[in-house]
Amino acid sequence: MASSTTNNPALDLDSDTPENPGHELAQFASGCFWGSELRFQRVVGVIKTEVGYSQGHVHDPNYRLVCSGTTNHSEVVRVQFDPQVCPYSDLLSVFWSRHDPTTLNRQGGDVGTQYRSGIYYYNEEQDCLAKKSKEAKQKEFKDKRVVTEILPAKRFYRAEEYHQQYLEKGGGNGNKQSAQKGCNDPIKCYG
């Protein structure tokens, strides 16, 4: 990671790079990161997923601190993908299908700023595609405003290990869910 360009490293742009130079990174916030991650794990062309925290103002946050509502972090899924196999527009389609983008700071029973809807881009092309997709989604919601924020991807803080691939590993009750590419089984979130 490059040295901080501000007095607060949490406010820096995410300067991590994909493991393969032909791959790209993307960050999405759409409520609890467990179900969101599993949905992205199933996408052909997604190489790796990690859950974590981004867009906040506290350096090196943890789950408990983020859930306190004092850090302004989003729960995010950072996706490493091969754009030759999975265009960014496909990831945007997965993002929009996974949550209600008209609810501010909540998804279902999960309430708090960490559950907000957000697309955090790494380059101008992602920014442009994200904005176009939001405009298209807004047309579907005639009477509701899409509240999804679209911002540059700030520093990514990887969540604690037990959150990584949580539903694939069985979640809180041991019922493993498939992360197989192309799987369309319903995603059941549980702690």
Curated annotation (Swiss-Prot):
The keyword Metal-binding does not apply. Its EC number is 1.8.4.11. One of its GO terms (biological process) is cellular response to oxidative stress. One of its GO terms (molecular function) is L-methionine-(S)-S-oxide reductase activity. It comes from the Eukaryota. GO terms for cellular component: cytoplasm. The keyword Transferase does not apply. InterPro entries: Met_Sox_Rdtase_MsrA_dom, Met_Sox_Rdtase_MsrA_sf, MsrA_MetSO_reductase. It catalyses: L-methionyl-[protein] + [thioredoxin]-disulfide + H2O = L-methionyl-(S)-S-oxide-[protein] + [thioredoxin]-dithiol; [thioredoxin]-disulfide + L-methionine + H2O = L-methionine (S)-S-oxide + [thioredoxin]-dithiol. Keywords: Oxidoreductase. Residues 1-20, 168-191 are annotated as: Disordered. Belongs to the MsrA Met sulfoxide reductase family. NCBIfam families: msrA. This is Peptide methionine sulfoxide reductase. The lineage of its organism: Eukaryota, Viridiplantae, Streptophyta, Embryophyta, Tracheophyta.
